[in-house]
Amino acid sequence: MVAIGWLIFVIWLSQPWIHQLSQTTGVIAAYLIIAGIAYLPGYISAFTLTSLLLDKKAELPTANPSIPITILIAARNEEKGIGETLEHIARQEYLGIIKIILIDNGSTDRTVEKARQTAERTGLSLMILHEEIPGKHNALNRGLKEVNTPFLITLDADTFLHPSAIRFLAAKLQISGPDVHAVAGSLLVQNNRGSFLARVQEWEYYLSIASIKRMQSIYQSTLVAQGAFSIFRSDAVKAAGGWPDSIGEDIVLTWKFFENNGRVCFEPAAVAFTEVPESFIHLIRQRKRWARGMIEALKQVSPWKIKDPTSRFFTGLDLVVPYIDLAYTFIWIPGLFLCAFGYFGLVGPNTLMVLPVTLIIFYLLNLYQKRLLGQLGIHQKKSFIGLLGFIFVFQMIIAPVALSGYAEEFFKQKRVWK
């Protein structure tokens, strides 16, 4: 209701802007333009802010489960990081049995040898499988056939776990109802001292992605149990048919849970450190995959097929995301340049009404994250330049890239994973 009230207020406040813009575009076009760059982003921001304010304070989970768990790691040429990934698993403060299944997906380096050596040195229970058909979903489904534990975790081969990560993730799933099919872990950036792009993404993971997941989890409708680090009920994954043949296999599987009347949560205390792209070309490829994955989910699991109203609401919001990206790319960015020449019809003072709400969200989440991560003994020094890049530049890069990803999926172009 607060978000709707904010939307009504902004529409009322924007009437002079509508009047000015409609002189050039017409009334209907003016409303459509302003909806893409102000109304819809403002509504989503107000909804997020209100939800976070109503949420409980950050507390570490107290349960200490001992349920047997299987970790699936799909790997292709991960010689560089697989040893350290396994070493972090060996340091877990978890009382239960941890089985690890490494699925080699056609590696041409020493990934398997390195993994076997590390497992022998650390005493890990490691099974190595081989799946020659390329594709992460093929590798994960090959490993799924060997899972005989109630819970399973997917972990990327270059992702390092905090010592309490598995305990907190398993505790969240254990105390949740049987209709909670998965819990997403919290990802922070591992290579945060790398390139400028890596420092920008550090803030994106720390603030933006965390705030969205935490907000969605309040309603048990986290839209992505990411493959990099999430826990699942094994029988729920099998009932959903395993991971689909999609470039966004984790997104589509999550939505399959919704279709099967399941729910998905997020545990902010279950922290893992992942490696983000440092080069522009790798970042573009990653974000195209994410954009295509969202469209795949919308096509394979339409929001109107989901019975639960909250999950239907959140998946339905993704229907307007391409429109927001379109408006940002072709209206907001050109509008900024026009501001320099004194034309404020597209972007001006009224447009900036969205910015304070967004900054308040980031400020509140920063306080939440600092308190929570402080309890875990995690203290990362973050780049101020990266913060400025995240707030003022990053979306200008990501929105056009997302549009190209949508287009690639629409025209069924070849999928590129790396």
Residue ranges: model-predicted function:
Residues 11-42, 48-53, 63, 321-411:
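Membrane-embedded multi-pass helical conduit in multi-pass membrane proteins
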Residues 97-106, 129:
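Short beta-strand/loop segment that forms part of the nucleotide-sugar
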Residues 152:
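Short aromatic/hydrophobic "clamp" motif used to bind/position activated sugar donors
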